[in-house]
Amino acid sequence: MNEILKKRLKLLKNNFGTHINKIANKKILITGANGYIGSILTLILHGNAKLYCLVRNKDKMIDRFQEICGDIDKIDIYEDLYKIQDKIDIVIHCAAPTQSDFFIENPIDTVDIIYTNTKNILDFSKKNNVEKIIFLSTMEIYGDVIGDNIVEDDIGKFSVTNIRNSYPLAKQISEFMVHSYSKKYSLSTAIVRLTQAIGPTAQINDNRVYMDFIRSAIKKSQITLFTKGETKREYIDVFDVATAIIFVMCEKKMFEIYNISNPNIFISIYDLAKTISAKLNVQVVFDLQRDTSQYLPSFSRRLNSKKIYQLGWTPLFDLNQSLDDMIKYIKEVNE
């Protein structure tokens, strides 16, 4: 296993071992287990719980997890949800398209994939009397709500003529389905609304903005901004996302929604680019002539994450640690 990941796992177990042990021996289904967050959950829970990983491509999952951990023992990997015969205790539904280009080029597929997969997971959970379902959502569901204290009850609006909104609208209707199944069928469910995750194991071809910066800096010796970079938001380390989800897994409430963010990492896209450029010793340049219709409009948004903090959770990684580990990891695995 990569040394960065070894150190992080040790830190997590030293700080959150009690909560990790609470779900020891549970049978946990993780959808999208070869994705950014799903793979970290798999890494952390591997060896503590019995894991069932649902993915689109089993071979890619094996390659991904061998890169991260080097050991796929005690993990059952499936491409078909309905081939899982064992009694599942907990479902963590991570699977969803995450690429902005895909949302714009395939808006109908985006909505269909997110909604249909969520409904299938809910039907599976109802049929199998699952103890807990956790649905990963996004801060994007707040729509046009901006400000410094956005709570889980805030509601924004979306333009139905903006194709890019296929993603948050699909997540929003899926949240509605999660709550409806909880109410109608007495399923214990939770929704976690995530801000942007950062940290090691992000893949080199990921199109998140910070990966564009890092990739450009490594390959082209400069970072190019196609907007003024005025959007300002919170970021959170992917390992902190995973531990927050573990805390939610341990809760017995029938239904709850949690904002998940690190209030200490609140930064504009421009300042993030400058921070990364300083670490890689490159320049930031602007190219404001490109079509930016695929980007969200500029905004400033800070989530109120009081609920998750009240469970006793706290993030362990600051911006510098997240970026340093991410850059080092990318360089090591792509040598």
UniProtKB/Swiss-Prot annotation:
An MF annotation (GO) of this entry: oxidoreductase activity
Main function: NADP-dependent oxidoreductase involved in the biosynthesis of capsular polysaccharides. Catalyzes the reduction of CDP-6-D-fructose with NADPH to generate CDP-6-D-glucitol.
Subunit structure: Homodimer.
Binding site for CDP: S100, R164, D212, T224, F226, T227, R233, L296
Alphabetically ordered keywords of this record: Capsule biogenesis/degradation, NADP, Nucleotide-binding, Oxidoreductase
EC identifiers of the protein: 1.1.1.-
Catalytic activity: CDP-6-D-glucitol + NADP(+) = CDP-6-keto-D-fructose + NADPH + H(+)
Enzyme class: oxidoreductase
SUPFAM superfamilies named among the record's database cross-references: NAD(P)-binding Rossmann-fold domains
Name of this chain's protein: CDP-6-D-glucitol synthase
Residues annotated for CDP-6-D-glucitol binding in this entry: S100, E140, R164, T195, Q196, R208, V209, D212, T224, F226, T227, R233, L296
Pfam families named among the record's database cross-references: Epimerase (PF01370)
Recorded metabolic or biological pathway in which this protein acts: Capsule biogenesis; capsule polysaccharide biosynthesis
Positions contributing to NADP(+) binding: N34, Y36, I37, R56, K60, C94, A96, T98, Y167, K171, A197
Source species taxonomy: Bacteria, Pseudomonadati, Campylobacterota, Epsilonproteobacteria, Campylobacterales
Taxonomy, superkingdom: Bacteria
UniProt xrefs under CDD domains: SDR_e (cd08946)
Family: Belongs to the NAD(P)-dependent epimerase/dehydratase family.
